[in-house]
A protein has these predicted regions:
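Conserved anion/nucleotide-ligand pocket segment
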Residues: 1-8, 12-16
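Glycine-rich phosphate/pyrophosphate-binding beta-alpha loops
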Residues: 75-86, 133-147
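Oxyanion-binding "anion nests"
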Residues: 80-83, 91-116
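NAD(P)-dinucleotide binding in Rossmann-like oxidoreductases
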Residues: 94, 144-147, 151
């Protein structure tokens, strides 16, 4: 949060450094601009956006994982201030990933929504966790879109105190989530089997977006979304 309130030459949401001197320069500029918190330096995992995965889980008040759902991002926002924000997500399934993260969450006695970002490392065939967000992510509607309403899990647990049999639901889905116009998906997602899957979902109507909710639509909102989409188109063309 503190990072959002400072400004300096070269400021981005995230960086990839090949030169230690460049790293030192950015760190100095950040602290000179008023940043006071720690910084995280991680090994760069090779590969494009399609190597990413995002996992959402709901853990109840008794620290039991009730539901897990995995997404396969195909495209991210390319702009410097929003790098890493997902723009297109396919549903995915990986029981090995589910079970390892389930064990971790229950071992630390976690409670609430957990949102994990990870990337497949082709160097050793393992998924490397980048972070856990202690909240829903900005793209977490892809879980609800695929039939697993995150808000309902809160109500069932904290309001209704619905009994849980201990069998964690590992979700499977069939819908593509988009934050961007369909034209950007078609133009910028790398060619391959995953893109073909997404194209079939678009053609069959098995897709959705957080933005265009019909019951919340009015002329001003429609114009705002069109403006947002025009910014996305300029951003992808530029970066």
């Amino acid at each position: 949060v503190e990072w959002l309130n400072i400004d300096f030459e070269g400021r981005r949401k995230a960086y990839i450094f090949n030169d230690p001197a460049e790293l030192e320069t950015i760190i100095k500029r950040a602290y000179d601009a008023g940043y006071t918190s720690e910084m995280v330096i991680q090994d760069f995992i090779p590969g494009d956006d399609s190597r990413m995965r995002v996992l959402n889980a709901y853990v109840d008040q008794h620290h039991r994982v009730r539901m897990m759902f995995l997404g396969h991002p195909l495209l991210e926002d390319p702009s410097p201030v929003a790098a890493g924000n997902y723009a297109a997500i396919l549903p995915d399934y990986n029981e090995g990933v589910f079970r390892r993260i389930k064990a971790f969450l229950e071992d630390i006695k976690y409670e609430g929504v957990a949102n994990f970002d990870m990337k497949y490392d082709e160097r050793d065939g393992e998924y490397k966790l980048f972070e856990i967000n202690l909240r829903q992510g900005r793209s977490s509607y892809f879980v609800t879109l695929n039939g697993f309403n995150l808000a309902k899990y809160f109500v069932d647990d904290l309001v209704e105190d619905t009994p849980f049999d201990g069998n964690t639901l590992f979700g499977r889905g069939s819908k593509l989530w988009l934050e961007i116009p369909k034209s950007i998906f078609l133009d910028y997602v790398a060619e391959g089997a995953d893109k073909e899957t997404g194209k079939r979902m678009l053609k069959s109507g098995d897709w959705g977006t957080t933005l265009e909710y019909s019951k919340d639509m009015n002329p001003l909102r429609w114009l705002m979304i069109r403006h947002m989409f025009s910014i996305y188109k300029k951003s992808y063309a530029k970066y």
